[in-house]
Amino acid sequence: TDKDWNTIIRYFQYIDSEKISYRGEFAFDNNSTEYHAGEKLHELGACNNCHFYGEEFPTQEASTWAPNLALTKERLNPEWVKEWLRDPQAIMPGTKMPAPYLPDKDILAMDGAEDDWGEELVKLGGDSTAMLNGLRDYLWDIKGKTNIDATIKEYFDENGYEFGAEEDDFEGEDDWGDDEDW
């Protein structure tokens, strides 16, 4: 939600002692080894399972949906994105967002690693900072419509607002415990 994103933004502003949100244009090289390694990490991580890309819907059901990645460059500081990717749970405990798997140098040195991980990731030799830089740069380059409120509303108007119930759900209980606990 916007509230969650604004909480994350305020957190990063706080740790950076930043009072203003304006930042100059972030430049990256979309032909670099880091960028292409980030693209591969993105592909392997299946970010599109949960995240929107402009008006492109996630591949999983609505209960797993996460923010529109086309908003990354509009809302966030590039360094914040790296820290978020490094350990989302440290910043927002309980978030569904997993940290991306970053293969270490031993994994990338194995026979067949280039086939599994791609040439660019192998070239980085397990450098996690370079991998996170590349993933951040790739996310920064995602294009698409940023305000998709009407698209999402239309989806729910057509498909309803119900999320699938668990088989073990009881009458009057949601997936977070008894309603009276709230």
Model-identified regions with their sequence ranges:
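Gly/Gly-Pro-rich "capping" loops immediately C-terminal to redox-active cysteine motifs
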Residues: 1, 52-84, 96-110
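C-terminal capping alpha-helices of c-type cytochrome domains
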Residues: 1-28, 101-173
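C-terminal, active-site-flanking charged/polar segments
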Residues: 5, 15-17, 71-83, 88-94, ...
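Detector for the c-type heme attachment site
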Residues: 10-17, 43-44, 49-57, 74, ...
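Short helix-capping and inter-helix turn/linker motifs at the boundaries of alpha-helical repeat units
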Residues: 25-29, 57-60, 72, 126
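Sequence/structural segment immediately N-terminal to covalent heme-attachment motifs in c-type
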Residues: 30-54, 130, 148-151
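Long, ordered, helix-rich scaffold segments
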Residues: 31-35, 41, 70-74, 99-100, ...
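Long, low-complexity, intrinsically disordered segments
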Residues: 171-182
